[in-house]
Amino acid sequence: MQGPLYIGFDLSTQQLKGLVVNSDLKVVYVSKFDFDADSRGFPIKKGVLTNEAEHEVFAPVALWLQALDGVLEGLRKQGMDFSQIKGISGAGQQHGSVYWGENAEKLLKELDASKTLEEQLDGAFSHPFSPNWQDSSTQKECDEFDAALGGQSELAFATGSKAHHRFTGPQIMRFQRKYPDVYKKTSRISLVSSFIASLFLGHIAPMDISDVCGMNLWNIKKGAYDEKLLQLCAGSSGVDDLKRKLGDVPEDGGIHLGPIDRYYVERYGFSPDCTIIPATGDNPATILALPLRASDAMVSLGTSTTFLMSTPSYKPDPATHFFNHPTTAGLYMFMLCYKNGGLARELVRDAVNEKLGEKPSTSWANFDKVTLETPPMGQKADSDPMKLGLFFPRPEIVPNLRSGQWRFDYNPKDGSLQPSNGGWDEPFDEARAIVESQMLSLRLRSRGLTQSPGEGIPAQPRRVYLVGGGSKNKAIAKVAGEILGGSEGVYKLEIGDNACALGAAYKAVWAMERAEGQTFEDLIGKRWHEEEFIEKIADGYQPGVFERYGQAVEGFEKMELEVLRQEGKH
């Protein structure tokens, strides 16, 4: 007899995954449905449809129903005993919204176990599509959101972020303007995460306390929707109507929403006692997969760079994102997203290889060697200026700049900053400089979110975790540790592409097995086998070096402001 099992679902842009763990957090089953490869009847590409004339990107909701049928069938084929499943949670692509019709609750309640979800729920939606995070059709609405409370800083302070095209508030506002009749006939609006939970509950589930922060509507400090922003978003239908559509938001991320709907008991053999737990967003689920403790930092080094941190400090800024932590009251998730990441590093790598006549140009060996041979900030002697640069092959959002390259020399003794005048040995000096540039930006923007780990040691993360392609690179790891610190070191995380589903599954384990008042970090931390997932790859805090980079952060901030001024952005 197997012990209890838990499922975490991950509904992303290109696939739905169901991952099953036991109480010891061991993965026992995985079932995937790839939208492009496995779906029938949808003219999608990479999971979405586009209307380029209006910059719209969206997914057919019926596709997700087909995918859930497919994933559950996949688990059945693997011989999983559904009666062992004790709890279900999920992770959804953030910001996406689902528009339910007036008959949705009735259709959800009356599901016939002999038929698929797709056959029965196709008519449950007032609008057949869900806007995707790649959608950029809402510039007008974003401008109005940014102005509503006085400016971007005020909006960021209230909701954790300035207005973004993909955020649900601006999307709903545009929806009610574009489709006023459909909006009136919409009974409820779900996020992708609460949509997953609704399907299993057999009625509309509330939104999750963390994912609700990706809407530009939730006032994080007040713990309630912001009336002014609701008013702006709702248009002529009014605030009360929009509040009804959105529903209440429970504060406990581990609340038991209710038992699984009898449809799943009859069709698959789930136990009627299987409990549904709020599903959260994909980024909040990622910090649960670690589990990321307060002051830990995670850097995802893919095509773009994402920085995630769990922190007790709430210090919002228009360039960053704050969300409520998905499980732990009093903590926040801090997030930074950059457009320029891997591509910018690869261009320097290729230039270094070309200069050395190395083929193929895609090998990292020379880039690593040059990076490690170059002294911090390119300073061969203490009296040399620090070499600072911005390297943006594509337009950047943090800070908001066109594509381009800028190089400066900074003197920390007198704080002077000069455009570089031929002192760079290109492209060799750029190898270290580009890694430093990316890491200094992370350190600058996460200032004030960490504590001192001990007597006489400056505030810094406890651990720095690296994930994604760049985490395999020893030179990048070494520079990351020198700049970001990490009192326990820099670790490579081997979680593959399962992070979101794992985090959701762990959330279900915690919600069902916690003692009264037991935090997620405590319960999961005791059971997590870190040696299976992580490997220490570099030292973190190094006295002297960390402090020198602290001076470089000041120069880096000056450089950004100077470039913004030159570009007429400041």
Curated annotation (Swiss-Prot):
CDD domains: ASKHA_NBD_FGGY_SpXK-like (cd07776). Keywords: ATP-binding, Carbohydrate metabolism, Cytoplasm, Kinase, Nucleotide-binding, Transferase, Xylose metabolism. The keyword Mitochondrion does not apply. One of its GO terms (molecular function) is D-xylulokinase activity. It catalyses: D-xylulose + ATP = D-xylulose 5-phosphate + ADP + H(+). It is found in: Cytoplasm. Substrate binds at H95, R166, D282, N283. Induction: By D-xylose, L-arabinose or L-arabitol. Its EC number is 2.7.1.17. InterPro entries: ATPase_NBD, D-XK_euk, FGGY_C, FGGY_N. SUPFAM superfamilies: Actin-like ATPase domain. ATP binds at W364, G469, G470, N473. Its main location: cytoplasm. GO terms for biological process: D-xylose metabolic process; xylulose metabolic process. One of its GO terms (cellular component) is cytosol. Highly specific D-xylulose kinase which participates in the catabolism of xylose. Xylose is a major component of hemicelluloses such as xylan. Most fungi utilize D-xylose via three enzymatic reactions, xylose reductase (XR), xylitol dehydrogenase (XDH), and xylulokinase, to form xylulose 5-phosphate, which enters pentose phosphate pathway. Belongs to the FGGY kinase family. This is D-xylulose kinase A. The lineage of its organism: Eukaryota, Fungi, Dikarya, Ascomycota, Pezizomycotina.
